[in-house]
Amino acid sequence: MTTALDQLKQYTTVVADTGDFQQLAQYKPQDATTNPSLILKAVQKDDYKPLLEKTVKAHASKPVGAIIDQLLIAFGTEILKIIPGRVSTEVDARLSFDTEASIAKGRELIALYKEHGIGRERVLIKLASTWEGVRAAEVLQKEGIHCNMTLLFSLAQAAACAEAGAQLISPFVGRIYDWYKKNAGSAWDEAKDGGANDPGVKSVRRIYAYYKKFGYKTEVMGASFRTPGQILELAGCDLLTISPDLLQKLQESTEKVERKLSPDSAKDADIERVPVDEASFRFLVNDEAMATEKLAEGIRAFAADAVKLEKLIEALR
């Protein structure tokens, strides 16, 4: 029997969401994504301590921020030895509201990859989907630096990213699901509110339909999954980035996978254009409590893990 993972690959580019690159090969993903939390998790494992120690030792005289950049590149370089496609490397979340600093950091990361012999076509620079992050992506894209817009929870964010010419967006499925489930409390009914009605799944489907209907080239990569079911409800999405534990579950399953999203069906979607000027963007994101709360929470969490990583590095110097 064909596995659910292999069936999914017929419709969607499968991406591995992990810093634990030793797990990559068995799932044969095209691309890989990392973030500060995933790198922090990986360097705390014994398997990656030599890479951490080697990186810190080689760059011990540099500021801690520069050492973190080198560590991100070290992980990205190892990942690219295993996968045929692209790796996503994230800009420090503490720069989420600073356009110029985000642009500078994106350029720095691409330059560091170049020093390791890796061309920019194999790297996606991850930026938070704030107004400032979107503006940074607009500049970087014009320089041929491809951007992956993360912490994306609303159609307003997605519309702004597409208008800015971002290469790819990562709308978060599981975190949207978490918010609605938590807020519903005892009224939540998984049978009724999950599956195709899952708020996170519906959000990505709407964004996908918007892009295809209006002819945007920006790739849609569903992210932040909680269950295999959420993933399979988005079969046909351009890309899906999936954690190793869920990749394993899909590999062990022989459930029949049907295509749920396609460009042709999306073109008939009943959906209006969203204004993407700054005032509209800020109002629309603010108007959606889930998007506002999850964006702020996500930035705080990634920033906190960056601080933990700094402390870990300082302790090794």
Swiss-Prot record:
GO molecular-function terms, A-Z: transaldolase activity
Gene3D superfamilies found in the cross-reference section: Aldolase class I (3.20.20.70)
Coiled coil location: none
Record's keyword terms, sorted: Cytoplasm, Pentose shunt, Schiff base, Transferase
Enzyme Commission number(s) of this protein: 2.2.1.2
Function as written in the Swiss-Prot or TrEMBL entry: Transaldolase is important for the balance of metabolites in the pentose-phosphate pathway.
Designated name of the protein: Transaldolase
